[in-house]
């Protein structure tokens, strides 16, 4: 099955929510664990243990594992394995972006079948040009994995750059969308885009997009499940809303309750 087919099956079975695994210090505190590798593993794997059957996908943020060095990366490997065993998809949030052999190296790290950190999909940055990401696109197609390219992110700092006008008159975000739409024709729809759910005006039109839309910003950043329709309009069926702190920030015992509160809000 292609990534797009696996994602569609997961959404049909479990709904379209993606749970972010962001074991930041405040979350470790809420769970009552130490700021060490053991605490990291308790939180990260505990999220999947409790919610593994209740979400289509999980998005571990690599930045919270990397400070612990090799031991933290080993925890991340186990978390990715847990997600797969739970029958959900893993979207590893690494936001990599480079050119040539360097981008090919990043692709091998996350998209090769035998990679220790192999994930169903990853996030990448197009700042060096969408074309610079082709090594990742090609390997993802060969291994039936997915890619989510940043276009209009949920943080307010990105607006000046991402809504800036290109020589064609389109915004930078729209330019990224248009390039991905064209590439998706030959890449089996595996190329997705990151569009923040926090914006009243995206500064781009995703209605003609032919891939998945990863939509961070639901919950703690202010967006709600109910507000997605007004943000994405005709593209709503493509949206994979992502929430993290709103769900995981109350400790293990509150995980399922907070998940339901988010979905009903």
Regions from the language model: what does each represent?
Residues 221, 238-265:
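C-terminal functional extensions of proteins
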Residues 13-17, 53-56, 86-88, 118-120, ...:
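Short, well-ordered coil/turn segments that N-cap beta-strands
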Residues 1-91, 168, 256-264:
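Conserved N-terminal beta1-alpha1 strand-loop-helix module at the mouth
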Residues 13, 23, 94-192:
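Conserved anion-binding
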Residues 11-12, 48-54, 80-85, 137-143, ...:
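Acidic (Asp/Glu)-rich catalytic clusters
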């Amino acid at each position: 099955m292609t990534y797009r087919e696996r994602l569609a099956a997961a959404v049909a079975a479990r709904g379209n929510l993606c749970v972010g695994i962001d074991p930041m210090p405040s979350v470790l505190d809420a769970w009552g664990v130490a700021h060490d590798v053991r605490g990291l593993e308790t939180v990260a794997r505990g999220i999947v243990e409790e919610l593994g059957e209740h979400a289509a996908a999980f998005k571990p943020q690599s930045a919270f594992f990397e400070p612990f060095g090799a031991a933290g990366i080993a925890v991340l490997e186990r978390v990715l394995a847990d997600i797969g065993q739970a029958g959900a998809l893993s979207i590893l949030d690494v936001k990599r972006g480079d050119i040539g052999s360097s981008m090919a190296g990043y692709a091998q790290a996350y998209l090769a079948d035998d990679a220790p950190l192999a994930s169903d999909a990853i996030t990448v940055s197009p700042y060096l040009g969408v074309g610079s990401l082709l090594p990742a696109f090609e390997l993802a197609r060969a291994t039936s994995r997915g890619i989510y390219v940043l276009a209009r992110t949920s943080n307010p700092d990105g607006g000046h750059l991402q809504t800036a006008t290109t020589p064609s008159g389109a915004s930078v975000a729209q330019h990224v969308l248009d390039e991905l739409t064209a590439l998706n024709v030959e890449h089996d729809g595996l190329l997705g885009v990151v569009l923040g759910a926090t914006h009243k005006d995206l500064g781009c039109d995703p209605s003609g997009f032919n891939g998945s839309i990863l939509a961070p910003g639901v919950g703690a950043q202010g967006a709600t499940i109910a507000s997605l329709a007004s943000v994405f309009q005709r593209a709503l069926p493509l949206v994979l809303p992502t929430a993290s702190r709103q769900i995981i920030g109350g400790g293990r015992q509150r995980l399922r309750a907070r998940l339901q509160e988010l979905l009903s809000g």
